[in-house]
């Protein structure tokens, strides 16, 4: 909708990044952009985007201890169901494979809206590749501002992992306190 930008205070996405997770030829595209790169390209061209990409979400990976703390803070029963399931997923997806942490990608995007200090952003020009066979869906970030194009995106660079864990645990404690 052409009037949408004037109604938005801030447009934050979990997608893109300085590396990807889907293409076989070097993992240049991130799934949320790759699934519809033409639409993503329009978004980046029409809106000022705050991009929480894979590079930033991976910098906020949580440990097994963090997940155990989250379960304890949520309490028993249905309140802890989602956290327990997320912990099971982390066990299979990461911990059983020898990794010592796991990422809750979308939660970092939400946390960056709640508390902007959780993520360091830099403003750069970002182009979405939507025609290249090999790099289709890649977010090309002009980190050195060589293109001469006006920066159109706040790119999440690195998370404050401790602050992110604190925000997540505070949320779990809140839900754990509900009757």
Which residues does each PLM region occupy?
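Conformational coupling and interaction surfaces
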Residues: 34, 52-179
């Amino acid at each position: 909708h052409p009037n949408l930008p004037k109604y938005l205070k801030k447009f934050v996405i979990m997608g893109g990044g300085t590396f990807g997770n889907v293409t076989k030829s070097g993992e240049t595209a991130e799934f949320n952009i790759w699934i519809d790169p033409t639409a993503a390209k329009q978004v980046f061209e029409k809106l000022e985007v705050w991009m929480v990409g894979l590079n930033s979400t991976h910098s906020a990976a949580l440990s097994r201890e963090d997940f155990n703390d989250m379960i304890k803070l949520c309490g028993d029963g249905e309140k802890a169901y989602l956290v327990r399931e997320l912990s099971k997923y982390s066990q299979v997806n990461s911990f059983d494979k020898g990794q010592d942490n796991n990422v809750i990608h979308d939660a970092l995007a939400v946390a960056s809206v709640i508390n902007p200090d959780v993520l360091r952003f830099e403003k750069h020009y970002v182009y979405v590749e939507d025609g290249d066979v090999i790099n289709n869906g890649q977010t090309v970030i002009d980190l050195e501002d060589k293109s001469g194009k006006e920066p159109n995106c706040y790119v999440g660079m690195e998370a404050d992992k401790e602050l992110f864990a604190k925000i997540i645990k505070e949320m779990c404690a809140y839900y754990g306190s509900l009757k």
